[in-house]
Amino acid sequence: MDSTVVIEPAYNALSDVRALFEAYTAMLVTHDPAFQIYLDIQHYADELRAPAAKYAPPDGRLYLARVDGRAVGCIALRRLDGERCEMKRLYVQPQYRGRGLARQLIRRITEDARQIGYRCMLLDPLPVLEDAVRLYRQLGFYEIPCYNDSPVESTLFFQLDL
């Protein structure tokens, strides 16, 4: 039997968002403890308390991926300025990876970014996220110079022209 996959706005399921954000950030801090400093710079504790505020329409977005009703992935979009936005918090639970969910989440957020009127989307993954980095490249993201204040030396910086 095929699973039912739904990509939906997450504003009415913030407890699911928080759980996925926590799993995502725990994974990153495990790979590089310096990532905790970056989370602090980003005021992550505030974001976790009120995730909808940072990613609210009309300039932002927040989505969940559900498989058979279960929240298994997330993605967010935030405004940097009038022409640039940033993809944040792309995460799919390990047992659901390899099913194309990350690709679906990215497609949804890039469609929204185009509709909002952004000209490009930026993101700053860690190289340890090899599968994600490979996917970003496949989807047309390319490396750019540093665009933020990440203290994690290994951070990569990508852009997608919309």
Where are these regions (language model features)?
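Conserved GNAT acetyl-CoA-binding A-motif
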Residues: 113-125
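Conserved beta-strand in the GNAT
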Residues: 64, 70-79, 86, 91
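A short helix-loop-beta-strand connector motif used in the catalytic cores of GNAT acetyltransferases and
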Residues: 47-64
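Conserved beta-strand-loop-alpha-helix junction that forms the acyl-donor binding cleft
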Residues: 94-97, 122-132, 149-154
